[in-house]
Amino acid sequence: MPRPRSGPTRKPPYDPSVAVAALSAADPKLAKLIERTGPVTLRLPSQQSPFEALAESIIYQQLHGKAAATIHARMLASFEPLCGLGNHPSPQHLLDCPNEQLRSAGLSKNKMLALRDLAAKTLDGTVPTLAAIKKMSDEDIIEHLIQVRGIGRWTVEMLLIFRLGRPDVLPVDDYGVRKGFALTFLGLKPTQKVTPDLLATREQMERRGKKWAPWRSIASWYMWRACDLAAGKIVQPQ
């Protein structure tokens, strides 16, 4: 599960308690996990354009949260003379800036190329606006955004769940979701060494996930919680 960013947050655009009630009724084993881990505490960050959210995702890829946040802040600060304090650069600003400006912020060559490709594809309409994306299906959004260099299906699925608040996304390739599924449904023990053959397969998850529609994002959130529970990071409700 992506690390939460600092800053203002908002509620999801759906009622999590409705999702929890439906999931508990549809899947008794999931209901037991929900009882052990408590209610949904998911919060979304303030709304961003797809361009801004994906730019941040690119910067955060394969980095610890603190290091990524520092690089992101440096990049934003480098554009302050053009954009003002705290404002995100536009796609055109990113295309026009010299490589040295981005390199000085701590960005690698691959991330610079990915950011410039994101900017170009935003300007040519491949990356939709926030208004347009709200009218698109999850699969349409994925199809559009994975055309950007450095953006794969998993990154878009995380954007759908944690930025756009889409309720019915099942990221079957996410390690945490696969492990949480194995802990909850396949008998994986919290102390057991995890090997690939012990994790849930795509087919197993998709089959059971049919029970969870149209709330698969919330079910996925509970798979991550199952991992936290196994690691002793959750105090179970009394």
Regions found by a protein language model. Give the residues of each.
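Alpha-helical ds-nucleic-acid-binding substructure associated with the helix-hairpin-helix region
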Residues: L63-H64, A68-R149, A213
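C-terminal accessory module of base-excision DNA glycosylases/AP lyases that mediates lesion recognition
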Residues: M1-T41, D138-E139, R153-Q238
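Helix-loop segments that flank and shape redox-cofactor active sites
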Residues: G38-F51
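Short, aromatic/basic-rich helix-turn unit that serves as a nucleic-acid recognition element
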Residues: L54-I58, Q62-L63
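Generic alpha-helical structural context detector
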Residues: E56, A73, A77, R116-A120, ...
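Active-site phosphate/pyrophosphate- and oxyanion-stabilizing loops and adjacent acidic/basic residues
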Residues: S57, A73, E143, E206-R207
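Alpha-helical scaffolds flanking conserved acidic
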Residues: S49-A53, P89, H93-C97, M205
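Residue-level marker of regulatory loop/turn positions in helix-turn-helix DNA-binding domains and
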Residues: Q48, E52, K134, V148, ...
